[in-house]
């Protein structure tokens, strides 16, 4: 009986203990990642702590920078970078990550670049030249605008350019770490061993582990490499470009460039930006353009951001309709204007040709529809490309889609055929060639290259095409001449959207000399930028002292 009672008491004690003390829960299993992938959270947390991101809400930085003009190279080649237009003196940038706004301002010599262009991508001729030394560029959400001069009129930039500007808020160490905390960022991480850069970092001895964290920022996937000191070094994404498609866009920083800005905040003071691949050993591109922006920007003011960057109504309400305004130049010859760049349609007996396919696919589609109305039931058989600057060539792929043959200078062919007119997928802004590639692109009749001259004819009408050289602005320039109509078609040599010069530049002198040597007799010059003018209005300037 005693044993029975003692057993009962033991059972009661065990039940009471069970009810009084909850059973210890097992620790959840660590999150599993596929082979090659690692947890991004500890990497991001350590990086934020290392450079004091949580203490930084905004920053104003100042210094001197350079501007590389994407797509404005004289000639596309393995060792030819984007041209640097001028230094950006008194460069100042304010980035506010509480409001996701940005303001940039600097001084640059007037008359060298379009007023709407700051650096890198976005150069569009015909939009108006910079006339005041001081330039201001602002970004708030989807709105981007500029002011030429401190009291200049706020002017919106086209949406396809404004949508790229926000990546600058993220392609820096603090901006990336803040963007990684936004809804939808969905961070992912991987690792790799890295050696130093060939020819820069000395003998390659021992690779080091580098972590790569990738986030989404709107439609852009942005990557950051994080070294063993938890410092962000390379921030990289792709942006859409009418010529190069998904174009590499990155900023690079070194550990040595970070300074202590106070309150635990570290911020880089040397900027180095690439737009386009800088690694010609591996990218296999023909174009080597890459350096777009950079320089010593050593004055760092954390949490100083006085300008609210409010969007002006004139910017908020700005529209950018794609319109084509047609002017008949002669029977079967039409100027297709209404934009920064013109095209010219020429009718032949059983086909038509278009002189210049500028800007982008939207522009080309509008022009093509207008040509079909003006010259019905005749295919657009040829499109003549004046030069390989991106704003003049950006619409060519659309003509490939409809089956036209491109006529360009032979020096452009390798660049176009490899980097530009290809089947490479365009994921950020697909165009018609990337969506519906013609099955015989590699074998089809898509190219005619010109060395000195070329003639399109139907036996009645001739369109003579000539190589214009030498030029400082660009290599491989073509012009066209209709002898019966005495119309001279050209790009970038006589721009009537701006007042004519009082003296001729060297390129204009050589253009005039080419017309004289070829014994052409134009009555009017028809520019890609601006309205046609009588040829004597241009030629008479030669009597003045030239530059």
What is each residue range found by the language model?
Residues 327-371, 477-496:
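Conserved beta-strand hairpin/beta-sheet module of binuclear metal-dependent hydrolase folds
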Residues 204-309, 478-483, 490-491, 496-507, ...:
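Gly/Pro-enriched, hydrophobic low-complexity segments
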Residues 55-62, 99-103, 205-214, 231-235, ...:
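Short, hydrophobic/aromatic-rich segments at coil-to-beta transitions
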Residues 283-349:
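Zn-dependent metallo-beta-lactamase
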Residues 487, 511-547:
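Divalent-metal (often Zn2+) His-rich catalytic cores of metallo-beta-lactamase-fold enzymes
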Residues 362-407, 517-521:
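Active-site metal-binding motif and surrounding structural segment of the metallo-beta-lactamase
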Residues 35-42, 46-152, 187-191, 195-202:
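N-terminal mature ectodomain segment of secretory-pathway/periplasmic proteins
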Residues 31-38, 42, 120-221, 239-247, ...:
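Flexible, processing/modification-adjacent segments and terminal tails
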């Amino acid at each position: 009986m005693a044993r029975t009672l003692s057993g009962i008491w033991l059972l009661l004690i065990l039940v009471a203990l069970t009810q009084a003390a909850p059973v210890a829960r097992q620790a959840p299993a660590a999150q599993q990642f596929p082979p090659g992938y690692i947890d991004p959270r500890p990497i991001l947390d350590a990086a934020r702590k290392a450079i004091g991101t949580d203490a930084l809400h905004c920053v104003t930085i100042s210094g001197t920078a350079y501007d590389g003009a994407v797509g404005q190279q004289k000639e596309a080649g393995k060792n030819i970078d984007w041209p640097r237009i001028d230094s950006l003196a008194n460069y100042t940038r304010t980035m506010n990550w509480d409001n996701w706004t940005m303001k940039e301002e600097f001084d640059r010599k007037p008359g060298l670049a379009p007023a709407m262009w700051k650096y890198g991508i976005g150069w569009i001729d015909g939009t108006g030249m910079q006339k005041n030394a001081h330039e201001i560029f602002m970004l708030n959400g989807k709105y981007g605008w500029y002011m030429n001069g401190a009291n200049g009129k706020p002017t919106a930039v086209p949406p396809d350019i404004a949508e790229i500007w926000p990546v600058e808020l993220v392609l820096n160490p603090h901006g990336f770490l803040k963007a990684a905390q936004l809804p939808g960022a969905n961070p992912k991480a991987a690792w790799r061993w890295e050696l130093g850069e060939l020819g820069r970092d000395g003998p390659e001895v021992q690779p080091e582990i580098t972590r790569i964290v990738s986030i989404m920022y709107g439609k852009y996937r942005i990557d950051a490499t994080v070294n063993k000191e938890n410092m962000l070094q390379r921030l990289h994404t792709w942006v859409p470009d009418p010529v190069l498609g998904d174009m590499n866009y990155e900023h690079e920083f070194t550990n040595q460039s970070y300074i202590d800005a106070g309150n635990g905040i570290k911020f880089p003071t040397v900027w180095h930006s690439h737009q386009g691949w800088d690694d010609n050993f591996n990218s296999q591109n023909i174009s080597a353009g890459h350096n777009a922006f950079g320089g010593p920007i050593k004055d760092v003011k954390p949490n100083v951001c006085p300008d609210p960057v409010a969007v002006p109504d004139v910017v908020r309400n700005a529209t950018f309709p794609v319109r084509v305004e047609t002017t008949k130049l002669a029977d079967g010859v039409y100027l297709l204007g209404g934009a920064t760049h013109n095209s010219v349609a020429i009718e032949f007996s059983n086909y038509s040709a278009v002189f210049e396919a500028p800007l982008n696919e939207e522009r080309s589609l509008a022009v093509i529809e207008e040509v079909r109305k003006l010259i019905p039931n005749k295919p657009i058989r040829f499109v003549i490309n004046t030069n390989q600057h991106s704003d003049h060539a950006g619409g060519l792929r659309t003509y490939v889609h409809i089956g036209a043959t491109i006529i360009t200078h032979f020096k452009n062919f390798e660049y176009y055929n490899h980097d530009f007119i290809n089947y490479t997928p365009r994921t950020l802004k697909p165009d018609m060639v990337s969506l519906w590639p013609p099955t015989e692109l590699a074998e089809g009749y898509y190219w005619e290259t010109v060395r000195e001259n070329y003639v399109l004819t139907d036996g009645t009408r001739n369109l003579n095409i000539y190589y214009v050289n030498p030029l400082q602005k660009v290599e491989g320039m073509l012009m066209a001449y209709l002898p019966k109509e005495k119309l001279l078609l050209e790009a970038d040599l006589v721009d009537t959207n701006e007042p004519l010069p009082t003296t001729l530049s060297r390129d204009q002198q050589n253009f005039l000399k080419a017309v004289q040597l070829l014994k052409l007799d134009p009555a009017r010059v028809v520019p890609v930028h601006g309205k046609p003018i009588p040829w004597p209005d241009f030629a008479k300037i030669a009597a003045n002292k030239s530059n």
